[in-house]
A protein has these predicted regions:
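Charged, compositionally biased N-terminal leader segments and the immediate start
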Residues: 1-14, 18, 22
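Gly-rich Lys/Arg/Thr-decorated short loops/hinges at beta-loop-alpha junctions or inter-strand turns
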Residues: 2, 98-110, 128-133, 159-163, ...
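Hydrophobic alpha-helical scaffolding
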Residues: 9-12, 24, 50-54, 110-113, ...
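N-terminal entrance/gating region of PLP-dependent enzymes' catalytic architecture
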Residues: 14, 37-122, 128
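Structural signal for hydrophobic packing residues in well-ordered secondary-structure cores
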Residues: 30, 42, 64-72, 124, ...
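Short loop-beta-helix segment that forms the pyridoxal 5′-phosphate
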Residues: 108-112, 129-148
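Conserved PLP-enzyme active-site core in the AAT-like
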Residues: 145-249
Length: 249
């Protein structure tokens, strides 16, 4: 019997005699026979794989660079919140490539590094500075998920009989899809552009999916007239040069 409570047995694997006992138990004479009985014959690749001769790391690097020259570089016009960005080398070297962010470990929580915690805190502070919010979390999965969570927060904050959520017509389609998925089981109705008295919250995309900048003052005042909370789906980079959502009230 293998002693599974010991490190060696758990992590190094079975010995040859152990393999023999296991094969005997399932009536197989070898591992090859086990594979033949397990994997359907029509998908087993019996020929030898054709590999190129081995090469040194330096030669492989040069060869990869030469292959990359055959790529066709095209401009992307996808939009919809996905924009090319440039990371300055000083940030790349001192932040993304700095091992100090991911090697200093926290004694009380060994699975999370102190550097990562500090980076998340800096991220949250940056979001607070750019948006004008009092607090900020450490990010969600993506913008669509964040919009859905914001809708749910507005729904719970209002604690009323309102079940309508208004979305700006030029919202990113991927965001709208997630909103609809989250709203349906809760009985929340999604409407576009024009909130009514049954609206508890309204999502405004700024800049919108076409890159246009909205007049938030007018939109927020309309929402207030219906006692609806305003949620701004903002491009963080744009807030460097634009008013923060808080400045619009």
């Amino acid at each position: 019997m293998i002693e599974i409570d010991k490190f060696v047995s758990r992590h190094i694997g079975p010995r040859n005699e152990d393999i023999g006992e296991m094969l005997k138990l399932i009536n197989c004479s070898s591992l090859d026979e086990l594979i033949e009985k397990t994997v359907p014959n029509h998908i087993i690749f019996k020929d030898k794989l054709k590999f190129r001769p081995g090469m040194s790391e330096e030669f492989n690097k040069i060869n990869t660079q030469l292959l990359s020259l055959k790529n066709n570089f095209k401009k992307t016009y996808i939009g919809m919140g996905y924009y090319n960005t440039i990371t300055p080398s000083v940030i790349l070297r001192n932040i993304l490539e700095n091992p100090g962010w991911y090697t200093a470990y926290t004694p009380y929580q060994p699975e999370v590094s102190q550097g990562r915690l500090e980076m998340l805190m800096n991220f949250q502070q940056m979001i607070i500075d750019l948006t004008g919010m009092d607090i900020a979390n450490a990010s969600l999965l993506d913008e669509s998920t964040a919009a859905a969570e914001a809708m749910m927060m507005a729904f719970k904050i209002k604690k009323s009989a309102k079940f309508t959520f208004c979305v700006q017509n030029k919202c990113h389609p991927q965001t709208l899809s997630v909103l609809k998925t989250r709203a349906k089981p809760l009985g929340i109705k999604i409407i576009f552009d024009n909130p009514d008295d049954d609206t508890f919250g309204c999502l405004i995309q700024n800049p919108d999916t076409y890159g246009e900048i909205a007049n938030l003052n007018d939109l927020i005042n309309i929402n207030k007239s219906h006692d609806a909370l305003s949620i701004i789906a903002a491009d963080i980079m744009s807030l460097v040069v634009m008013k923060s959502p808080r400045d619009f009230g």
